[in-house]
Amino acid sequence: MLVSALWLLAQTCHVLTASRLVQPLSEAPGSMTVIDREMIKASGFRTIPELMRLVPGMYVGYADANRPVVSLHNSTDEFAHRMQILIDGRSIYLPPFGGVNWADLPLLIEDVERIEVVRGPSSASHGANSFYGVINIITRDALSQDGGSLSVTGGDASDMSARFGKSGEKLDYRFSVGYRSDQGLNNSVLNDHNATRIFNLRSNYHPNASDSLDVQLGNSNGGYGLGISGRPEDAFRETTAQSDFQQLSWLHLWSSEHESKLTYSHAMRNSTDPHLCIDSNACQGLYSSSSIFFLPGFTRQEVYSQRNEIELQNTHQLGADNRLVWGGGMRRDYADYPLLLVQPRTLAPWQIFAHDEWHITKAAVLNLGTMFEYNGMGHKNNSPRAAFNYHLTPEHTMRIGVSTATRSPVMAEAYMDANNTIFGGAYVPPVTALTPEKILSQEVGYLGEFRAQGITVDARIYIDQVNDMILVDKWVAPSKGGYADSYKNLVSAEFRGVETTLKYRWNEGRSFVTANYAYQRASAALSAFPTQYFNSAADPSDPSVYSSIGDHVRRFYQSEFIDQFGQTVLTNSGSLLFSQSLADAWQFSAGYYFRGTVRVIDVSPDVTPEYRMRRLDLRLAKTIRYGKDRNIEIAGVVQNITQDDYTKYGTVNATAEVLFKQRTYLTASCNF
């Protein structure tokens, strides 16, 4: 019979994402964080991005308070396209911007079984853009829901969901429908509300002991507000977004030592911003017009993107001490974004990969892997990785690892054509010869598993060196008296840090505490010159301040990026999640999350950095059983109970009106 990978993962310290092989955490080739179902429930979080606060060194922010941003290392930009995000191994990274639109992800948090996070480059297993790390969201199996469930949340959030599933001899299925909404921080300052309707289905057909067919479908439909009060160039407006996906996987067991998996997936997203400002002078009325909604400079922005992908993976047991996984895939990325791409763009990348796990001795494990890929833009890259794990004792493991990764330019960077679209005929330098970003990562890790005591200790020290980082190529446009942007490989950066995790379980595993801490430092330098770096022409914007265009450009990069790069990482950050099972079916949990001040890369230096965060959340739940496998749960959650108000990622300076303050909500759920 087929062995369920999900069942294996449910056992203590087994992971899948690091190498595509199910491995004990002590034999994986990289540092990993696992967020299981119990942690998800105890956290009281309503959305998947919030769960990333339980990962050491992870930045979690919200663009203008309603569009989640998640990334390791520095706080990146709104699209966070240096992180690979997977759902059941399927990349949800979409053109033309890259990154993930977390706000309209067609997945309910109730359908998440566990989340595995690789804290470090993983292109050897998951391809370009697995640059800083990988988040793999593993959903609940089709047979996990036998019956129905309902859930309603009220208070400072309004959520509803219904789930139903059935298990049979050859067919299992589950489906979910839900509605998630949030009014944001303060609608009088930011138009930051959001609402999404979600449908998700998973079905598994297993006609015999050798074959399994898994079908997944999902759809989300909704939108969110945009706009900042008092800014005519960023007026209040409503966006719409629709996302859907389909995934079909066939797993065949050739023998007890060989299996193959063939997967096809399709994903689509369509979004509309009805009133985007593309000329701030016109939008602010500095040109002639009587009404903001008839000013030149506004346009309707529509973005349509889709991805089709097929992948074959083979896993072999080559002997008692060796396992190999290998395969390849092709995909087709398509984006229609008239505002910047002028014409629709299509990319057709492909990749082949292999990973070998060799138990040299009982104590020594060597992981070797690589991926060779063509990015569809004329570049071929190889991303090798090597890790050596040594069991000092059955409970103590040391790991040394070296890996490389690449990040291919996204369509919006590589093919942006702003001439005659945004800047009214002003010359904008074309994007030319962008090359993939590169990273070299070196780490030393330790894992202590004190099984008798229920304690796990995980720690790592790392140095990550990034070359050819793509950055805005600032262009002073004399014909407009302002600026335009292109892109260029401009920067080299280095990240150094320490990450630690302590887990302790007691009361037969029903109670636990998880503590995380991360310390990071970062520095950067220009590795190439911006196009106008040496331009001696007079600066049209403010000749009294800048002696030339080149002087303006040099000051911009030094003061607004290089000097402030160290502020874009979470220097000190951490979390503590505690859950205690009490008498009479009560459960109490508390989560504490902290980080220092941080500056987001793509927010103007005129905007105050995000305040430090010291946040305490509490959850108290009561379960009432009324039959076999039937229960009702009432849970109350108070977030930021100490009212240590903090800002989220945004383009407006923090005031008392735009802070994350105390929030309270109540959830009632039942199974039947």
Which functions belong to the PLM regions below?
Residues S123-A124, N136, S144-Q145, R163-Q242, ...:
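Periplasmic-side early beta-strands and strand-to-turn transitions of outer-membrane beta-barrels
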Residues S91-R119:
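Short acidic/polar hinge/loop motifs at secondary-structure boundaries
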Residues G165, N204-H206, I400, F512-V513, ...:
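Conserved C-terminal beta-signal and adjacent last beta-strands/turns
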Residues N208, G319-D321, V342-N467, S579:
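Structural signature of Gram-negative outer-membrane beta-barrels, strongest in the C-terminal barrel
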Residues L171, E259-D273, H391, R399, ...:
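Membrane-embedded beta-barrel scaffold of Gram-negative outer-membrane proteins
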Residues A320, V325, H359-A363, I461-Q465, ...:
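Gram-negative outer-membrane beta-barrel transporters
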Residues C13, T17, P24, M32, ...:
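Extracytoplasmic beta-strand/coil segments of soluble accessory domains associated
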Residues H206-S220, T240-K380, N389-T393, D458-I461, ...:
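Face-selective signature of the C-terminal outer-membrane beta-barrel domain
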